[in-house]
Amino acid sequence: MRFLTSGESHGPQLTVIIEGVPANLKITAEDINEEMFKRQGGYGRGRRMKIEKDGVEIVSGVRNGYTLGSPVTIVVTNDDFTHWRNIMGVAPISEEEQEQMKRTISKPRPGHADLIGGIKYNHRDLRNVLERSSARETAARVAVGAVCKILLKQLGINVLSRVVEIGGIKDDTDYDLDTIKKHEDSNDVRVVNEDIAQEIRAKIDQAKKDGDSLGGVVQVIVKNMPVGIGSYVHYDRKLDGRIAQGVVGINAFKGVSFGEGFKAAEKPGSQIQDPILYNDEEGYTRASNHLGGLEGGMSNGMPIVVNGVMKPIPTLYKPLASVDIETKEPFKATIERSDSCAVPAASIVCEHAVAFEITKTLLEEFQSNYMEQLQQQVDERRLRNIEF
C-alpha cells in the first residue's frame, strides 16, 4: 500500500490517491468524514477551521460502497479557496497584479520551511513554500488513515489516541484502554482527566494572549494486533522503524518513542523487559507492556503504544527576528493565520499516520487481493500464537 497527496493550503483542493487497498472493503464517504471532523476540532485552533468543512468525495476505486482493488482517489475541497482564487489560481498574473495582492512573502518564519525551501527551489516568493509545507496537507493524510482504520476494524484491530501533555501540563497516568477509549473525545483537549483539561485550556488561552504557541506529547494505541507483523531480518521492515518515520513525517513532530520510551534508559533490564506468559485462550502474552507491544521490530500481540512529540507551531503573532530575503535587512517574521495550539488535532493526525503504517505492513505480510483472503490469514496467525 502507498499513497500520494497533492494540493496547496489555499489551493482549490487536496487530492490523495491510495494504491493497494484490498477489494471488497465496505466504505463510504460518511465513514471517512467522521474521522475528518475529529481533526478539525481541538482547543486552540485558528479561524481557518471555522471556514473549512472537510467533507471528502471518493472519485475512484469504490463502487456501490465497496472497494474494487484499484486505486482509491479522494478529494478534499478547500472552501477558503474562494478568498484566494486570484492569488492561488493556476493562470499567470503580472508582477503588478501580484504586488497589489500584497500576499508575497519575503520574511521567513523561524522554525518553518520558508527559508530553506526558498533556497532549495529558488522561490523568491516564499508563499510557494509555505502553501505546500502547511499542515493543511494532513487533512489528506487523515483521509488515508480513515480508510486504513476501517480496514483494521474489520480485522478486529482498533486504533485510538489521546493527549498526554500540552505546554508542560501532563495527564500521563497509565490508564487502562477502556478508560482511554471512553474519554478520547470527551473534551476538546483530548486528555482523560477533566481537571487537567481545565489547566491546559488556561495555558492555551495565555499563550494566545501572549502571541505565542504551545506543543505537547500525544499517544497512539493499537489494540489486538496479530503477532509477528514487521521483521527482525531487515532494518527497513521493522514495524517500529516504519511507525517512527510515519510519526516524525507529520508537520512539527520532533520525536517518537514506544511504550515507556526514554524512561527505559533510567531502569535496569529486569524492570523493562516484559515476562512471557501463556494461557489456552490467548496463547503467548506478556505480564507487562513496558516495550509498547514491539519486540525485535515486530508486533508481539500486546497493545502497540506510540508516543509522539510535537513542537510549538512556528507561526507566532508576536513574531521572532528574521531577515527580508530581498533587502537582507533584519525584520520580524511574517505573520500567517495559525493556531495557538494544534496538539489535540495533531493527536488525530498521528493516530491516522500510525494506522497507515500498520495497515501497509499488514498488507505486505499477508496476501491481500481481497478482504476475505486477508481476514482468513490474520485469523490463522492469531491461531498460530496459541498453537505454536
Curated annotation (Swiss-Prot):
Cofactors (names): FMNH2
Q: Enumerate the InterPro entries for this protein.
A: Chorismate_synth (IPR000453), Chorismate_synth_AroC_sf (IPR035904), Chorismate_synthase_CS (IPR020541)
Q: In which pathway does it act?
A: Metabolic intermediate biosynthesis; chorismate biosynthesis; chorismate from D-erythrose 4-phosphate and phosphoenolpyruvate: step 7/7
Enzyme Commission identifier(s): 4.2.3.5
Per UniProt, the keywords (alphabetical) are: Amino-acid biosynthesis, Aromatic amino acid biosynthesis, FAD, Flavoprotein, FMN, Lyase, NADP
Q: Which GO terms describe its molecular function?
A: chorismate synthase activity; FMN binding
Domain of life the protein comes from = Bacteria
Show the catalytic activity: 5-O-(1-carboxyvinyl)-3-phosphoshikimate = chorismate + phosphate
Q: Which residues bind NADP(+)?
A: 39, 45
Assembly information from the UniProt record:
Homotetramer.
Instruction: Spell out the family assignment given in the record's similarity comment.
Output: Belongs to the chorismate synthase family.
What is the protein's given name? Answer: Chorismate synthase
**What broad taxonomic lineage does this protein's source fall under?**
Bacteria, Bacillati, Bacillota, Bacilli, Bacillales
